[in-house]
Amino acid sequence: MATKFPSFSQGLAQDPTTRRIWYGIATAHDFESHDGMTEEKLYQKLFSTHFGHLAIIGLWVSGNLFHIAWQGNFEQWVSDPLHVRPIAHAIWDPHFGQGAIDAFTQAGASSPVNIAYSGLYHWFYTIGMTTNAELYQGSIFMMILSAWALFAGWLHLQPKFRPSLAWFKNAESRLNHHLAVLFGFSSIAWTGHLVHVAIPESRGQHVGWDNFLSVMPHPAGLGPFFTGNWGVYAQNPDTTGQIFGTAEGSGTAILTFLGGFHPQTEALWLTDIAHHHLAIGVIFVIAGHMYRTNFGIGHSIREILEAHNPPTGTPGDLGAGHKGLYDTINNSLHFQLGLALASLGVITSLVAQHMYAMPSYAFIAKDYTTQAALYTHHQYIAIALMCGAFAHGAIFFIRDYDPEANKDNVLGRMLEHKEAIISHLSWVSLFLGFHTLGLYVHNDVVVAFGTPEKQILVEPVFAQFVQAASGKAIYGFDVLLANAGGAAANANAAYMGGWMDAINGVRGSNDLFLPIGPGDFLVHHAIALGLHTTTLILVKGALDARGSKLMPDKKDFGYSFPCDGPGRGGTCDISAWDAFYLAVFWALNTVGWVTFYWHWKHLAIWQGNVAQFNESSTYLMGWFRDYLWLNSSQLINGYNPFGSNNLAVWSWMFLFGHLVWATGFMFLISWRGYWQELIETIVWAHERSPIANMMGWRDKPVALSIVQARVVGLAHFTVGYVLTYGAFLIASTSGKFG
């Protein structure tokens, strides 16, 4: 007899209802809960999945390279990046009538194609690729890499090649390896690629597999390196008149500190980027020798943590400090994952900011739709990672936390004064919410009643002061870098001449610090409200995961439970999973405000109409009317009774996204009993219908659990939200700028 799914849980496999399928899917990746799981097997399984993950990433990159080479227009785009639209891939669709075929035959193609808004063309071009053949080579290389990663994943599951538990628990060696080899060497290797391939290509000198061993990246060779005369590598940089990809205006420097942007490409100088990666690489290689392993030199993390205690007799008595944290972290995968997700979440949000404020890829600053798409993409990923960090933090408290081992240390004391933390977050959220909404609503009322001069408009003077300190001249603050005769400004001019031009937007629209006013002040505080409320829900979920006054034994019920009946006066909605679920709604709300703000402010700048944002962003109707409604007008005319244009696919997705989003509420508002009754009625009808009753169920159909219905509702809400805004963003930007 065939074994029923799921094979990893005999208890579930024997469940006679459809619960078996849904619980099986829900716990497929919860390796800890699987039958016969040991700690060593758990680590080994997770280790192998990392190779599978790398293989998927490699295949994805390979697919992008392949489709651009096969169906794109990379070589034409390279010849004129500012005017040729990059093609992502061809579209073949049997539903296309002649109108759609004509509309999507664009960017010089002879058949329907999609325009690329990924920035991949700019990336490939910047790192030295100029021909389709090079893209194909890259694609094949990535496929080989993926095959190797898959093999490595398989190999490390074989008995002879499974690492031991002790190997996984060796934190010092792992940190040294990650710091020195993964971060350090890869950064230096990337410097090597930039210096040997990308920089010569940017100066019109081809470097490929045929000549890379014979072309010297710098005329002085390695002499200055070995003699310590490193300054030679910074001499003779590219001039401000350099034409990217040609010898015109090119220098010979490979490692510089110019600051600012290349005037033509409006991207960071490649020689600055190479210098940055070399410095980062060297620092990480040094850092990778920090922890004590084989040779008895360096730091022991355990000793560092044990030593970090407040002196005895400290006023306020700060407890046991960091004692016990080494084992707590080292023995909890959820704690480690929480730390990793939190770090990666912050970095991803910073990437969103820096990719547009300081673009590193040639000409990407002028591709406005790509800029908008990449900013939004990275901010959405950031909120997902951050919510995941707190989810695994909560699971740590439920499954891995040992109160005795953490008695009176910083972690134990966090739990002991959780009420103070949660109530402060609550107070901040309430303060921000009432004051920000109060200002917006006041402004709406006075504008509605015809007296816009009565708006409460607050200038963000502190933020303007910070901008001025970094060199922003527009506000007239005579401070630090904005003080033309001051020591700071003189030093800056000597060491990083391009910075002031970049800060003040001297060249083009690529202005590092945008001027800010009352509209920015208000939306900044709206975003602060969203961030603090999301944090409140997530932090409360984690700190209350083990128990609360209402439910002291909560940890015994696990991470996700619907409630413990009516006996305690209402225990629904208080599991750690419910906190995660509620927080995702607030996170989506917040990222919506962040991306609305970014997009509208930039649309106004790109269209040369900054007054629209400045005047309309101070009251809510301005946002609804002049951002959302006005910018969806082109989009919703993508198709109409008279035909369709190349926005049609986005307008259809806009509609479809709304549908998916609205479907979520069907699951979020109705609970399990309704569906169970409905299912039983449908089963009754099925069993009494001729022909239909010839087929039965192997599993008795039952409704989803309360928690599952919530996750289905949340999934629809999230996917619909993303599809709707993604379609709006791309169509409203590309409809104006291509």
UniProtKB/Swiss-Prot annotation:
> What membrane topology is given?
Multi-pass membrane protein
Output the PROSITE patterns linked to this UniProt entry. PHOTOSYSTEM_I_PSAAB (PS00419)
- Residues that bind phylloquinone: 675
Sites where the protein binds chlorophyll a B1 = 658
Question: Which Pfam families did the record assign?
Answer: PsaA_PsaB
Q: Which InterPro entries match?
A: PSI_PsaA/B, PSI_PsaA/B_CS, PSI_PsaA/B_sf, PSI_PsaB
**According to its UniProt record, which reaction does this protein catalyse?**
reduced [plastocyanin] + hnu + oxidized [2Fe-2S]-[ferredoxin] = oxidized [plastocyanin] + reduced [2Fe-2S]-[ferredoxin]
The source's domain of life comes to Bacteria
Using the record, list the residue span of the signal peptide; answer none if the entry has no such feature. Answer: none
Where does it primarily localize?
A: membrane
What keywords sit in the KW lines? 4Fe-4S, Chlorophyll, Chromophore, Electron transport, Iron, Iron-sulfur, Magnesium, Membrane, Metal-binding, Oxidoreductase, Photosynthesis, Photosystem I, Thylakoid, Transmembrane, Transmembrane helix, Transport
- Annotated chlorophyll a B3 binding lies at 666, 674
Its annotated function is as follows: PsaA and PsaB bind P700, the primary electron donor of photosystem I (PSI), as well as the electron acceptors A0, A1 and FX. PSI is a plastocyanin/cytochrome c6-ferredoxin oxidoreductase, converting photonic excitation into a charge separation, which transfers an electron from the donor P700 chlorophyll pair to the spectroscopically characterized acceptors A0, A1, FX, FA and FB in turn. Oxidized P700 is reduced on the lumenal side of the thylakoid membrane by plastocyanin or cytochrome c6.
Q: Which PANTHER family match?
A: OUTER MEMBRANE PROTEIN, OMPA-RELATED (PTHR30128), PHOTOSYSTEM I P700 CHLOROPHYLL A APOPROTEIN A1-RELATED (PTHR30128:SF19)
Q: Which family does it belong to?
A: Belongs to the PsaA/PsaB family.
Assembly and partners?
The PsaA/B heterodimer binds the P700 chlorophyll special pair and subsequent electron acceptors. PSI consists of a core antenna complex that captures photons, and an electron transfer chain that converts photonic excitation into a charge separation. The cyanobacterial PSI reaction center is composed of one copy each of PsaA,B,C,D,E,F,I,J,K,L,M and X, and forms trimeric complexes.
| Protein name listed in UniProt | Photosystem I P700 chlorophyll a apoprotein A2
User: Which organism was this protein described from?
Assistant: Synechococcus sp. (strain CC9311)
Lineage of the species this protein comes from = Bacteria, Bacillati, Cyanobacteriota, Cyanophyceae, Synechococcales
